[in-house]
Amino acid sequence: MSHRVLLVDALNLVRRVFEARGGAGDEEFVASCSQSLQRTMTELAPTHGVVVWDSSEPTWRHLLDDRYKANRDPTPPVLVNLIPGLIQRFESIGISSLTIENYEADDVIATLAAGVASNHGEAVILSTDKMFYPLLIQGVRIYHQFERRFVDVDEVQAKFGLNIDQLVDYWALSGDNSNNIKGLPGVGKKTAIDLLNRHGDIQTMLQRNDIKKLANAADEVRRCQQLVALKQDVALGINLKDFRLN
């Protein structure tokens, strides 16, 4: 492959370091985040890389459903105040940052990763967020920084009891508590797995008239699909060469 692109889920990285340290001690915390990222860059030897941050403004998902992530505590103010210093420190080790207004980092990363993979490059996402798993079937790789290993397709399919390409429909049906997405009433994890193993996908289920759980629920389940699926068409206005690493 001509290039390996490292796509860093910024808040996933820094919040885990923050929690592991029991808080942020300004310079020591910034240094720990920088050292952690630099170690991974040394291990993976990417040719390109970018640290992607969430927009500070409400995203399109919040507009679609105002309950989205409403169950989460806000990012601690002390951590928010350290973000400019983190961006500066990351730039000092040669990797720049990116934020796209009204989009979460996940959508920006998914767009970048899909673009790299479709052009025969190797996209490596640095994150522990399960919502990236559906990208595995597109040739995208996911690296678990704190366990220092790549996520394996077979491992994910065994964990969920489903194929990778069924995960979006699984979360749409059963919900996703971490993002406060409720899913369909009366459909838990076991029922969602059973429905998908029998029918394959939501589209097939909606074409039937004998699945009581989905009766009169087409609009709701499609809304849930929108919420859990990562966008891969965010208008970025950037070029891969902007993220070339030395």
Where are these predicted regions, by residue range?
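Domain-level signal for Mg2+-assisted phosphodiester chemistry and nucleotide/NA-binding surfaces
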Residues: M1-G94, E147, L240
